[in-house]
Amino acid sequence: MELIVGIIIAVCIFMSFKTVVKACFQKNFLSYETVIMITYLYISLLVGFGMIYLICIQSNMEVLIEAGNPISGGYFDKLVTALYFSAVTLFSVGYGDLAPIGLGRFLAVIEALIGYVLPAVFLARTVIGIENSN
């Protein structure tokens, strides 16, 4: 069941990317709608990766450790921890209170890479759009 939910989450993340990429190539890139779409993309990435971490944690896979110990607590505690780690990773803050291990390292690298690349892509696209309008 967790695999099916994970696949659905991956498809949703891909569809979010597809929608934003499509919006990037419209005539007026820097608009209110585009900013809202970028915000939704970041939120969907944050929640999507958070759910992937949570699925792994709930499946007794050790993907995150806190102070050298696996994540413990109830479902809500694990959910909050997974979303927090996803946000800290996506926005490249990295406080150091949580650390990925095993598969979590691979997931964290993918999420951090996306977090680094997205602002550069949007900035470059905005500059190109401004130059083309002049």
Say what each PLM segment does:
Residues 13-18, 45-49, 53, 119-124:
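Alpha-helical transmembrane segments of polytopic integral membrane proteins
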Residues 40, 44-82:
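Outer-pore turret/helix-boundary of cation channels
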Residues 1-11, 75-80:
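Alpha-helical transmembrane segments of integral membrane proteins, especially early/N-terminal helices
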Residues 5-23:
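N-terminal signal-anchor/start-transfer transmembrane helix
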Residues 23-24, 55-63, 129-134:
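Membrane-interface elements of multi-pass transporters and channels
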Residues 81, 85-134:
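Pore domain of cation channels
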Residues 7, 11, 38-47, 113, ...:
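Alpha-helical transmembrane spans of integral membrane proteins, capturing the lipid-embedded, hydrophobic core
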Residues 27-43:
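Alpha-helical transmembrane segments and their helix-start/interface "positive-inside/aromatic belt" motifs
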